[in-house]
Every structure is written in structure tokens, then in C-alpha cells.
């Protein structure tokens, strides 16, 4: 039969795959004989198409060999019981498959079952799993007993005997088991086993059944990621079975050796495999895998050198239908190197045989790789777009949630409780669901014989049995495209960079999803052919999950209610690639919202719907937790505030009316909203000055844009005054030097250019003043300040000043060309005198001592007149001739100085000058005399006015002082009082610069007075504790009512017993509060900013007498507020009125507390009588008057009883007095009611005088009382001494009471 196949068909390089197919069903039926899986595969042949031509050829080949199938079925039927044992046993058993085949042939009873199974295998395509079992190895180990029988079937294609031994066993199974079968196999096996085109096909356990010749040659030089499944196969393992024994050592251990084990056949097989299979080239990348991962193998690189191997057009392979789909989707290039690490252990004993690979297949593989890379890039771009859409959606969701959070306040606590309850319920429900799912999975595993979707992965399992168990245990599987190691590393680097960027941009709520995304770095990104699948670990405690990407079957209901594409993986998980730790998973599960089930999923969402689902999962979780925490903190604060409010209400009922009553104060806070908009605009402007650098954003100082103002305020703008100064300098240049240049010969041809330069510089200043400044000056029209450019320009053009400015700039200099440079042509420049006068006014307005400038200006007028006269004198002398007469200038010395001296003597009329001789000289001299008299008289008068204005205040002070002294002398006031008055005048004048501020305030409007009062007094009044919390406008109104008064040292500000109608605020200086028995003891010293007398001012029910004397310690300036003015203000501010009354009541209560210590008996209470003494008294009383020395002890005992009764009565009287005083002193300052004398009851003890109002402690009256106690107490214990105030405030009455009289009163 085999010879016929060899003659008809070309030599198939993958014939060992046929044996793999035969070996695959063996473990299937072997582990699951009782589950009756055979009828089920016949029902499910349709969902798995067979698109590839090579697998189609493999299927008919299986049909042509019916006798092999039953034998293989038998082998599989008996291989099952040893699967679990082999998982724990040593992996290597070289002749396991062949031996198992022989043993099963010895059983004719199983021939029918095996033949039926092989026939069923024709109909049902057998899927081959490359490495899905390796990925889910841990999950599969959790329940090998449950699902091992089902998972054995797909592993048949990757069985250890798939390469060479499988064909041998399949052919030996056609006949009875005997030695001749082995001999015949030995002779014909060489014909059946052709040289494989690619070493990866011969090495692979599972993929060889699916790998065809046109696909594999492209990938032998590429690196594929695989994981070491514990490196099971040792050296003695057969080369044929070696790659398969590595993934599933348990299967080999379970197979029993046949009774006739031919050693020759094993040696021959080893020799042939060494020649046929190429040796893999190992790389260091494999060592980077975790050594502790038994279910995975390291990545290996296989180098295959093309040698005399011809390209094969057709390859006959026995391949399952599932593998046909896998070849179409994944390609053989990604599956060839899975078994390379397995062969790594045996590479030392094997010879590397280079094989020739077809170039066409390599090109096809490269094209596929390029396509895959393009698809991956497209997928990444789509993912980035999706992430951007996610972020936008998240921001929108956040905004919506923030709005909802404002509406939800107190409901959060209830929701939190409900969420906890729901979580507990969901946990219970999930546990129940997991149990049900496990049961359903077991049932479905029994019903389903073949997997629905191929599951490929980068992992290689230890044995085909484990792989099959895992594949059967998973009800949902999908094919994952395997990539070479280099491509995988690039993907990992790219994804890591993306994750780093996302971590910087996204918030904490997105970090959970980033950790999930990191887990998918080792997997292949989802594509159209390979959509992603999220894996849900039903045994979450066993270990972390492996990220897998599979296609969820439509008939499988979703495990998790939140995710429809979740794959439940029962069983314990072994060590795998580094994934998020269990602690991280626990944190992620805690962060999930109660609506989501605790499913840990790793995936890159391929659709916007999946992306939305994951975003909601993380965003709602983190946001809910943050919202709940914030809400709880707010609730705690609210509860604290409510408790404080309730306490205040219970303590003082006025608080309720203060807070519950509608307040107009918020209406006054409304204007603050308008200025709030200005900072927003300012911030908007400031944002422009932020500079973004590499990773930070900092604020830089904006460039100062010096722009000329659009309008100028001539009254307050200092820059305009400075400009006027330069204009005045130019004007003075012309006024002073034009006459000099005209009269004196100082302008010559050698320096004419300097004079002209200065002239035209002054002209330029004039021109700027006209064109730039004067046209921008603001002016008042109809009460409004006009700042419009056009109106300001028109106003200047229509003014008289513009006309004078035009005249002063007449271009008479053009006449220089005809008349020469004559300085007189520049006389119009002196017409800009209006700028000079304006400058004087503006400068005097800003100077603190304007009279100084006035004096200087008047002196300048005098000097200028002398300057002009000297120029005229030199001109007259030159007109008549220098030195022609005795009166003219003789030309000796400095001409200007000598002429100036002559002008001074002439104008001041000092005399001593030569007499004029000619008519011209006489007329000129007369004009000089008249001018001098007029000029000097004006100058002297102006000087007097200037000096008088400078001393006007001092003059007023002297006049007031003189009037007051005259008044005091007229009424013969004592000299001491007169001195105090004079001192007051001097101090007030020197400290304030005026005698009465009110005189100035009366002249100003209310707004001006308020502004001045705020600047002067607000800082002091705002620090007063009494007015803190009051309406700010009320304080402003109060400032206008304050009066400033100066007190001299030792002046009484207020005296004890006076009716308090004023409150005092210390502005400067100190005052002392006096008290004590003599009223001279200093109780307290109050400094600037302190307040006293406020209780009398706020007293409601009278009793507002002063309780102490207050004396100025030095010169003290006090602000006084009358009670009448305060009441008028408080009428408009009811809330502030209630607040002030509340504070006044508290002060009264605080001042009433010390009364308990004041009403104390002068004689201190006696110590308790000793018990022994009482016993002696009792005995003496029994003995009668005779005992105890004539009854002295009995008499003493009676006395003690009387004293005790008197003390009790005194205490009752004190309590009554305290009750009365507390009622009467409701509104009195500093418990003023208690200070009123009560002579009606001379027997009750009277308190000593109390201290003044707020800050003064009670006067220490213990010293005088102690002195009386020392004087009167010891000599006469039966006498009671009391001190009570007399009719006058400064008098006290001392009363002495005998005990006998007191006794009668008590009786």
C-alpha cells in the first residue's frame, strides 16, 4: 500500500504529519473513551472548512488508508489512562508511540473501535493547536481530569510520533502485531519518509500537521517567540519523537513498550532523523525567558542553509481541517520554529543537515510579513484615533458627571451602602455563575469533540496531552497570529513608548487601563483575521491570567455580564511571562464599579464599542471613588457646622435670629463680582506671557510696551509736568539769550553754528509740544472729562494758546538769507509764555512747600528785569559810542558784568552814578528809574505775600492762643489750668498742624470726608474686636462720626460713676485704668488700638455708669464715638446691631463672673472642729454645769453653733445679692449695676468697687479687708466687721456688729 502511494504521489516532505494525525486521535480516545466523543465529531465537520490544497490532499490520503485508522483509534483508546501519570513522570520515552501502537494491535477487540474512529476522522477535520496549550497550560492543569480526554484529540496532529514513527505505527497497525511487521516497516519506512523541505516542519509537533511545503520555507531564518515547556527530552530520546516528547512528556511515559521492542529499529530511526532533520541554531534570546516557567520554552533562531534540495511543487500531508484554516490565516512561517527549542537539548548529539529551501516560499513569506506589518501600522493608527476619541468622550463624561455630582449631595452615602451591598451580592452571584459555568463547560466539553476556532499562540506546551487538555477545557478559542521575535520586540518597544506618553497625558483613572494594556505587549495585536478576546479566569485565586486573543463563539453565552467577549479559563495557572501582579489585579478589581464583574482582561480594543466599555469601567470606578470621598468630607464639614450652630443657638437665642433672618449684606457683596471680572481679563492677558519649554510651562515677564498715551490728564500726569519743564527751559533760553545776542557782541561768525543749533533745538521742542502733547490734553466739557482724540484736537485748535503757539513759531528765520543772522528775528519765540504759567501752576499743585518755589520765581523776575536793563544800557552805550561820554560804558572789563552792575544801581536808585549829559541819556535814565521803582515795589510786595502765605497757619495758631490766654486772664483762671491749655495748643498744633480737623471736614463733601476718614482711621477701627464681623459699610458710616480729641497727661478721660455716653478708641498714646480702695491703683494700661467704654455705649436697659477711672498716661489722641451717633447708624444695620448686642451680653456675663469672689466675709471661715474636741464637748454637756470647769466647754460649744448659724445666714444673703445684681446689671458696662450703693440693708456685705469695662480685672480689695481682719479679728471673735460704700462715690462706711445682736436677728 505504501509503495503504491509512493508511486502515485510525489515524495511528501510532511508525511510525518500524517503520523501526527494518527497519533493525535490516539490521546483523544485514550483519555476520553467513556465520553463517547466519536459521534459528536461527525456532527461538527461543517464549521471547519479546508481551504488549503495541501490539507485537502492529506485528507484523501487518509481515506486511502482505512486499515491504519482503526489501529490508531485503538492506540488512542488505551493511551488515555496514562496521560495524567505521564504529566508527572519523566518526559522522555523514545519508543513510546511505536510501542503503544504495537500493544494496541495485540488487542483485536479494539480493532473495530479504532477503525470506526479513523473513519470518523475522515469526516471530521482534526484541528491542530500550535501553542495555545502552552499559554493556557496553567489553566489546563487545573482540571486535567475533566477535560483531558477532549483535549487529546487536537493534539493528535502534534503527537511525538508525528514525524517518522507515526507513519510506521500507522502502517503496522494495518496488520497483526508481530515481528515481521517491524521488519517490513524497517524496509519500507525509508520509502515513505521523504526528506522534509523545511526543518521546522519536521521538528514541530503540532504545526507540522498544518504546515505545508509552499509556506514553511519562508520562515526558517526568522525568529519566533516560544516558551520553554520545561525542556523535558533528554539525549537518548529518538529524534523522530524528540520534538513531540518535549511538549508532552507525559504521553510518552504513559505508552507501554511493546513486548518485541526492536533495538535496531530505534537506532536506525535515530540515524535517519539525524541525517534528515536540520540542527537548530540557538540564540541568547532564549535565556531571557523565565526559567521557572515550565509551560513555556525560550525563543530560538533556526538557521537553515539551502543545499541540494529541489523545490517541491506538491506535498502530500495528512492535515486536519482546522490546520487548513490556520495555514490560510497565519502561514506556516510563524509555526515552524515552535519545536526548535525542544530540539535544542538534543542538538549536541545530532548533526546539522543543511537543507535547500525554495526561494519562492521565502518571497511569499516576506510579502506576508510586509502585509502584516502594514496591517499592524494601520491598526496602531486606528487605535490612536480611538484613544483620542476615548479621551474626548471621557472629558464629556466627566463634565456630565460633575454636573450630576452637584445635584447629588446627601444621596451619596446611601448609594455607597447600596453599592457595597450590590458588590457583595454580585460576588455571591459571580461565585454561583462560576460554578454553573464550570458545570456547563463540562457538559459542553462532552458534547463538543472538535474546537470551534483555532487558537495559536507564542507558547509551546510541555506535551501534546497537556495541550489537548487545555484546548478542550477552553470552550472558546481563537487563532492568534505568531510573529517573529524581532517583530515582537519592536512592538513591545512601540507599545511601551505609547504607554509612557499616555501615562503623562492621562489621569490616574486611566492608569488602570494602561496596566492592562501593558499585559498585551507580548501578544499579537488584534487584526481583522484575528480579533481579540478577553480572558476571564474563573479560578482567580490560582494565579494571573494569560492575555489571549480569540474569537468568541456565537453559541457560547458570555461569562461576564459586562463583557460579551470574555473567555472563562478554569484551572490553576502556572508561571508564565511577566504579567501584572496579583496585588495590581486586586487594586484594579477594587477600583471597578459595582456594575462590572471582577474580570481581569488584557486587550487592545478593536472597536469603539469595546473602547467605550473599558473606558467606562475605569473612569466610573475611579471617579466614583473620588466623588464618594469628596462627598463624605463635605458631609463631615456640614455636620460639624450644624453642630456648632446648634450649640450657639442653645447658648444664645439671638444667634438664630442673626443667621435665619434675611441679610442685606450679600447685596453689598454683589459689587465684588464686577471687579472679579477684571482679574479674569487680567489673567487672560497674563496667559499670553507664559512660555512653553520642553516639559514645563513658566511665566515670563512681559515686554513693557511703552506706548504714548492716547490722552493726557494735565492736572495729575507727572510726565506732562516734566515735559512742561523742558518747554520752559526752551522758552527761558530764548527770553534770556536773545537780548544778550542782540546787544552784546557775543554772536560771531566762528560760533554762529552753535547758536543756531540751540535755537533750532528749542524750535523742535516747541513743535513737539504743539503737535504731540497739546492735542492730547483732556478737558472738561459739561461736567465730563473728554478723552476723544478728535475733540481734544479741536479744543486745542480753537483755544487762544494755539494761536500764541503759532505766532511763536513764525518762520522769520528765512529772513536770515536776506538780512543776515539777526537775533531779533527770533523774538516771537518769547510768546510761549502761557506754557511758563501753566508749569508754575502744575508745579505748585504737587509741591508740599509751594511758597519756596514762589519765592524763587519772584526773585527770578527781579533778576530778569535787571538783565534786560543791562542789555539796554550796553546797547545805548554802543549807540552813542563806547567811551564817548562819561555816562556810557567805557569798554573796560567784562561788558556784561559792568553793565549789570550799573543796572542794579540804577533800578534800586542807590545813586552815585554819573549824570546823563545828552538828551538821549537823560530820557533813558528816567525810564530806568520809573521801571526800577515799579519793578522793585512789585517784587517786594510779592515777596511779602509769599512769606505771609507760608506762615499763615502759624499766624492763625498764635491768634487763637492769644485769644484763649486773654479769655483765661479775664476770668482769672488758675495758672495751672492756663498752663495746661497752652500745652494743649502747642501739642495739637505740632502733632496735627491744625487745631480743629472738623473745620476742614465741614468744607468737604461726604464722599471726600469718607475717603479721608478711611485712610486715617480705618486701620485702627478695623482691628477693634468689638466691630469685627459687622457690616463694612456700617464701619464706614461710623468713621465719619468719630471725633479726634487730644488728652494731656493725667487728664481724666472718664470717672467712676459717670453716665457713659461715649466710646473711646485710642489712636495714639496710652491710658491707665485706676481702681482699688483709694481709686489710685493702676489696674490696666491700654495702648493704641484698644477700646474702652463700649459696654456703656451698648447697654440696653440702663445701668451704663462708669465703673472705673481712666486717666491719660501721656499725650493721648482718642477717637470718640457718641452713643447717639451709634444708635443712628445701627438703625440701618439690624444684623450688626444684633451682633453687637450679643457681644455686649457676653462681656456682661464675663464681668459678672468674678462677683462670687468679691462678696466674701472679712473674717475667713474657721477650720472644722476636731472630732476629739467635739467628743469632749459632748461629754462636758452631759456632765452639766459642774463638770468641765464650771461649764466652759458647754458655753464654747454653744458659741460655735451660733457662729455656724451666722455663716449660713451670710451665705444665703450673698446668693440673694448675686441674683439681684445679675438681673439689674443686664446692660450695664462692666457690671455697673453692682456698683450702685445699697444702704437699705446695712447688714449685708457690700462688694468693693469693681474694675472698669472690658479689659480691667476686678480691683484687689483684699488688702484693706485683710488689714481690718488682722486688727479686729483676733481680739474679739464675736464681732463682725463690714465695709460698705457711703453716699459719696469716694467714701466708705465701716460697720461693726455684735454677735448678740446678730443672734437676735437670726432668731
Curated annotation (Swiss-Prot):
Residues 952-1028 are annotated as: C-linker. It comes from the Eukaryota. Keywords: Calcium, Calcium channel, Calcium transport, cAMP, cAMP-binding, Cell membrane, Cell projection, cGMP, cGMP-binding, Ion channel, Ion transport, Ligand-gated ion channel, Membrane, Nucleotide-binding, Olfaction, Sensory transduction, Sodium, Sodium channel, Sodium transport, Transmembrane, Transmembrane helix, Transport, Vision. 3',5'-cyclic AMP binds at residue 1106. Residues 43-59, 361-386, 407-451, 483-518 have a biased composition (Acidic residues). It catalyses: Ca(2+)(in) = Ca(2+)(out); Na(+)(in) = Na(+)(out); K(+)(in) = K(+)(out); NH4(+)(in) = NH4(+)(out). The record marks 944 as: Occludes the pore below the central gate. Residues 1-720, 774-788, 838-849, 949-1307 are cytoplasmic. One of its GO terms (molecular function) is cGMP binding. The record marks 936, 940 as: Central gate. One of its GO terms (cellular component) is transmembrane transporter complex. It holds the Pfam family cNMP_binding. Residues 1212-1218 are annotated as: Calmodulin-binding CaM2. Residues 1214-1238 have a biased composition (Low complexity). 3',5'-cyclic GMP binds at residues 1093-1094, 1096, 1106-1107. GO terms for biological process: calcium ion transport; detection of chemical stimulus involved in sensory perception of smell; detection of light stimulus involved in visual perception; membrane depolarization; monoatomic cation transmembrane transport; monoatomic cation transport; olfactory nerve maturation; photoreceptor cell maintenance. Residues 621-631 are annotated as: Calmodulin-binding CaM1. Residues 550-560, 1250-1261 have a biased composition (Pro residues). Residues 1-101, 126-178, 193-262, 320-458, 470-625, 648-681, 1214-1307 are annotated as: Disordered. Residues 1026-1130 are annotated as: cNMP-binding domain. Residues 743-751, 809-824, 873-895 are extracellular. InterPro entries: CNG_cation_channel, cNMP-bd_CS, cNMP-bd_dom, cNMP-bd_dom_sf, RmlC-like_jellyroll. Residues 165-174, 387-406 have a biased composition (Basic and acidic residues). The rod cyclic nucleotide-gated channel is a heterotetramer composed of CNGA1 and CNGB1 subunits with 3:1 stoichiometry. CNGA1:CNGB1 channel binds Ca(2+)-bound CALM1 via CaM1 and CaM2 regions of the CNGB1 subunit; this interaction modulates the affinity of the channel for cNMPs in response to intracellular Ca(2+) levels. Pore-forming subunit of the rod cyclic nucleotide-gated channel. Mediates rod photoresponses at dim light converting transient changes in intracellular cGMP levels into electrical signals. In the dark, cGMP levels are high and keep the channel open enabling a steady inward current carried by Na(+) and Ca(2+) ions that leads to membrane depolarization and neurotransmitter release from synaptic terminals. This is Cyclic nucleotide-gated channel beta-1.
Amino acid at each position: 500500500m505504501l509503495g503504491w502511494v509512493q508511486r502515485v504521489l510525489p515524495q511528501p516532505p510532511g508525511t510525518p504529519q500524517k503520523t501526527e494525525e494518527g497519533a493525535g486521535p490516539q490521546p483523544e480516545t485514550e483519555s476520553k473513551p467513556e465520553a463517547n466523543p466519536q459521534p459528536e465529531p461527525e456532527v461538527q465537520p461543517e464549521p471547519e472548512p479546508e481551504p488549503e490544497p495541501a490539507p485537502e490532499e492529506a485528507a484523501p490520503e487518509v481515506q486511502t488508508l482505512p486499515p491504519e485508522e482503526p489501529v490508531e483509534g485503538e492506540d488512542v483508546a488505551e493511551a488515555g489512562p496514562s496521560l495524567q501519570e505521564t504529566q508527572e513522570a519523566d518526559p522522555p520515552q523514545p519508543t513510546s508511540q511505536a510501542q503503544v501502537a504495537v500493544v494496541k494491535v495485540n488487542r483485536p477487540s479494539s480493532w473495530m473501535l479504532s477503525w470506526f474512529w479513523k473513519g470518523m476522522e475522515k469526516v471530521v477535520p482534526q484541528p491542530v493547536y500550535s501553542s495555545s496549550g502552552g499559554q493556557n497550560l496553567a489553566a489546563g492543569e487545573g482540571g486535567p481530569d475533566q477535560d483531558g480526554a477532549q483535549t487529546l484529540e487536537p493534539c493528535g496532529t502534534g503527537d511525538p510520533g508525528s514525524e517518522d514513527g507515526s507513519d510506521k505505527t500507522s502502517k503496522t497497525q494495518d496488520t497483526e502485531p508481530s515481528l515481521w511487521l517491524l521488519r517490513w516497516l524497517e524496509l519500507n519506512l525509508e520509502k515513505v519518509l521523504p526528506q522534509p523541505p523545511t526543518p521546522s516542519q519536521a521538528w514541530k509537533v503540532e504545526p507540522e500537521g498544518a504546515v505545508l511545503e509552499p509556506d514553511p520555507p519562508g520562515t526558517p531564518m526568522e525568529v519566533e517567540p516560544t516558551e520553554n515547556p520545561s525542556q523535558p527530552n533528554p539525549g537518548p530520546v529518538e529524534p523522530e519523537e524528540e520534538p513531540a516528547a518535549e511538549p508532552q512528556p507525559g504521553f510518552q511515559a504513559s505508552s507501554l513498550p511493546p513486548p518485541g521492542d526492536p533495538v535496531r529499529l530505534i537506532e536506525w530511526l535515530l540515524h535517519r532523523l539525524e541525517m534528515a532533520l536540520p540542527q537548530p541554531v540557538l540564540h541568547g534570546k532564549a535565556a531571557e525567558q523565565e526559567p521557572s516557567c515550565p509551560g513555556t520554552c525560550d525563543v530560538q533562531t533556526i538557521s537553515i542553509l539551502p543545499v541540494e534540495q529541489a523545490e517541491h511543487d506538491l506535498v502530500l500531508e495528512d492535515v486536519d481541517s482546522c490546520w487548513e484554516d490556520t495555514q490560510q490565516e497565519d502561514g506556516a512561517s510563524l509555526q515552524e520554529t515552535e519545536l526548535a527549542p525542544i530540539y535544542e537539548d538534543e542538538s549536541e548529539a545530532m548533526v546539522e543537515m543543511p537543507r535547500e529551501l525554495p526561494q519562492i516560499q521565502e518571497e511569499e513569506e516576506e510579502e506576508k510579513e510586509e502585509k502584516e506589518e502594514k496591517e499592524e501600522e494601520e491598526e496602531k493608527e486606528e487605535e490612536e484615533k480611538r484613544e483620542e476619541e476615548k479621551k474626548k468622550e471621557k472629558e464629556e463624561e466627566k463634565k456630565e458627571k460633575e454636573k450630576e455630582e452637584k445635584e447629588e449631595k446627601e444621596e451619596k452615602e446611601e448609594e455607597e451602602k447600596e453599592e457595597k451591598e450590590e458588590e457583595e451580592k454580585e460576588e455571591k452571584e459571580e461565585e454561583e455563575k462560576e460554578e454553573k459555568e464550570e458545570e456547563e463547560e463540562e457538559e459542553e466539553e462532552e458534547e463538543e469533540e472538535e474546537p470551534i476556532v483555532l487558537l495559536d499562540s507564542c507558547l509551546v506546551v510541555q506535551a501534546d496531552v497537556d495541550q489537548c487538555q487545555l484546548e478542550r477545557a477552553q470552550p472558546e478559542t481563537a487563532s492568534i497570529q505568531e510573529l517573529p521575535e524581532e517583530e515582537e520586540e519592536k512592538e513591545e518597544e512601540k507599545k511601551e513608548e505609547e504607554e509612557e506618553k499616555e501615562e503623562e497625558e492621562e489621569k490616574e483613572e486611566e492608569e488602570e487601563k494602561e496596566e492592562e494594556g501593558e499585559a498585551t505587549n507580548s501578544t499579537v495585536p488584534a487584526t481583522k483575521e484575528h480579533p481579540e478576546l478577553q480572558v476571564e479566569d474563573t479560578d482567580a485565586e490560582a494565579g494571573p491570567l494569560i492575555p489571549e486573543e480569540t474569537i468568541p463563539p456565537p453559541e457560547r453565552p458570555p461569562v461576564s455580564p459586562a463583557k460579551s467577549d470574555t473567555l472563562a479559563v478554569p484551572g490553576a495557572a502556572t508561571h508564565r511571562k511577566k504579567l501584572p501582579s496579583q496585588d495590581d489585579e486586586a487594586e484594579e478589581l477594587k477600583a471597578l464599579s459595582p456594575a462590572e464583574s471582577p474580570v481581569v482582561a488584557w486587550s487592545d480594543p478593536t472597536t469603539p464599542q469595546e473602547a467605550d466599555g473599558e473606558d467606562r469601567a475605569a473612569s466610573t470606578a475611579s471617579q466614583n471613588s473620588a466623588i464618594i470621598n469628596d462627598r463624605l468630607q463635605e458631609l463631615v464639614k456640614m455636620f460639624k457646622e450644624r453642630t456648632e450652630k446648634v450649640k450657639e443657638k442653645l447658648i444664645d437665642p439671638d444667634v438664630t435670629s442673626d443667621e435665619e433672618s434675611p441679610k442685606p449684606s450679600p447685596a453689598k457683596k454683589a459689587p465684588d463680582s464686577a471687579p472679579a471680572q477684571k482679574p479674569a481679563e487680567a489673567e487672560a492677558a497674563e496667559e499670553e506671557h507664559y512660555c512653553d519649554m520642553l516639559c514645563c510651562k513658566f511665566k515670563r515677564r512681559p515686554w513693557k510696551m511703552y506706548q504714548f498715551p492716547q490722552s493726557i490728564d494735565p492736572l495729575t500726569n507727572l510726565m506732562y509736568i516734566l515735559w512742561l519743564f523742558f518747554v520752559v527751559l526752551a522758552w527761558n533760553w530764548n527770553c534770556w539769550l536773545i537780548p544778550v545776542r542782540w546787544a552784546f557782541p557775543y554772536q560771531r561768525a566762528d560760533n554762529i553754528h552753535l547758536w543756531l543749533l540751540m535755537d533750532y533745538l528749542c524750535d523742535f521742542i516747541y513743535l513737539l509740544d504743539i503737535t504731540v502733547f497739546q492735542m492730547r490734553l483732556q478737558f472738561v466739557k459739561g461736567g465730563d472729562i473728554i478723552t476723544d482724540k478728535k475733540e481734544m484736537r479741536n479744543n486745542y485748535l480753537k483755544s487762544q494758546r494755539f494761536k500764541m503757539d503759532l505766532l511763536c513759531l513764525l518762520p522769520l528765520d528765512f529772513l536770515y538769507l536776506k538780512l543776515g543772522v539777526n537775533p531779533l528775528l527770533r523774538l516771537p519765540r518769547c510768546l510761549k509764555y502761557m506754557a511758563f504759567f501753566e508749569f508754575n501752576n502744575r508745579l505748585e499743585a504737587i509741591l508740599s512747600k509751594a511758597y519756596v518755589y514762589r519765592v524763587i520765581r519772584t526773585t527770578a523776575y527781579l533778576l530778569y528785569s535787571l538783565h534786560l536793563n543791562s542789555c539796554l544800557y550796553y546797547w545805548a552805550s554802543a549807540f552813542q559810542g563806547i567811551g564817548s561820554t562819561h555816562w556810557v560804558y567805557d569798554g573796560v572789563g567784562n561788558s556784561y558784568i559792568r553793565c549789570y552792575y550799573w543796572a542794579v544801581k540804577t533800578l534800586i536808585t542807590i545813586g552815585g552814578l554819573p549824570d546823563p549829559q545828552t538828551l538821549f541819556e537823560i530820557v533813558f535814565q528816567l525810564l530806568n528809574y520809573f521801571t526800577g521803582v515799579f519793578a522793585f515795589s512789585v517784587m517786594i510786595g510779592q515777596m511779602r505775600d509769599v512769606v505771609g502765605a507760608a506762615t499763615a497757619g502759624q499766624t492763625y495758631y498764635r491768634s487763637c492762643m492769644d485769644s484763649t490766654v486773654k479769655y483765661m486772664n479775664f476770668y482769672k483762671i488758675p495758672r495751672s489750668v492756663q498752663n495746661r491749655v497752652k500745652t494743649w495748643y502747642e501739642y495739637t498744633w505740632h502733632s496735627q498742624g491744625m487745631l480743629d480737623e472738623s473745620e476742614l471736614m465741614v468744607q468737604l463733601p461726604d464722599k471726600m470726608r469718607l475717603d479721608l476718614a478711611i485712610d486715617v482711621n480705618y486701620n485702627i477701627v478695623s482691628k477693634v474686636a468689638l466691630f469685627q464681623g459687622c457690616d463694612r459699610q456700617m464701619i464706614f458710616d461710623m468713621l465719619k462720626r468719630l471725633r479726634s480729641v487730644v488728652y494731656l497727661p493725667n487728664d481724666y478721660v472718664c470717672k467712676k460713676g459717670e453716665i457713659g455716653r461715649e466710646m473711646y478708641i485710642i489712636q495714639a498714646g496710652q491710658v491707665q485704668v485706676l481702681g482699688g480702695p483709694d481709686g489710685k491703683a493702676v489696674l490696666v494700661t491700654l495702648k493704641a488700638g484698644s477700646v474702652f467704654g463700649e459696654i456703656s455705649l451698648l447697654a440696653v436697659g440702663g445701668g451704663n455708669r462708669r465703673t472705673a477711672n481712666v486717666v491719660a498716661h501721656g499725650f493721648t489722641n482718642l477717637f470718640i464715638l457718641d452713643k447717639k451717633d451709634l444708635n443712628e447708624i445701627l438703625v440701618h444695620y439690624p444684623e450688626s446691631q444684633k451682633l453687637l448686642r450679643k457681644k455686649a451680653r457676653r462681656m456682661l456675663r464675663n464681668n459678672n463672673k468674678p462677683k462670687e469672689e468679691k462678696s466674701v466675709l472679712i473674717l475667713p471661715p474657721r477650720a472644722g472642729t476636731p472630732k476629739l474636741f467635739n467628743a469632749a464637748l459632748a461629754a462636758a454637756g452631759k456632765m452639766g454645769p459642774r463638770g468641765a470647769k464650771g461649764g466652759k466647754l458647754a458655753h464654747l460649744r454653744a458659741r460655735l453653733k451660733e457662729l455656724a448659724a451666722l455663716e449660713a445666714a451670710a451665705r444665703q444673703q450673698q446668693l440673694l445679692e448675686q441674683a439681684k445684681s445679675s438681673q439689674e446689671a443686664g446692660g450695664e458696662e462692666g457690671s455697673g449695676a453692682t456698683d450702685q450703693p445699697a444702704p437699705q440693708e446695712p447688714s449685708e456685705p457690700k462688694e468693693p468697687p469693681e474694675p472698669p469695662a472690658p479689659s480691667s480685672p476686678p480691683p484687689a480689695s483684699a488688702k484693706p479687708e485683710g488689714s481690718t481682719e488682722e486688727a479686729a479679728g483676733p481680739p474679739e471673735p464675736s464681732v463682725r466687721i463690714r465695709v460698705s460704700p457711703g453716699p459719696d462715690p469716694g467714701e466708705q462706711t465701716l460697720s461693726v456688729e455684735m454677735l448678740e445682736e446678730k443672734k437676735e436677728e437670726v432668731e
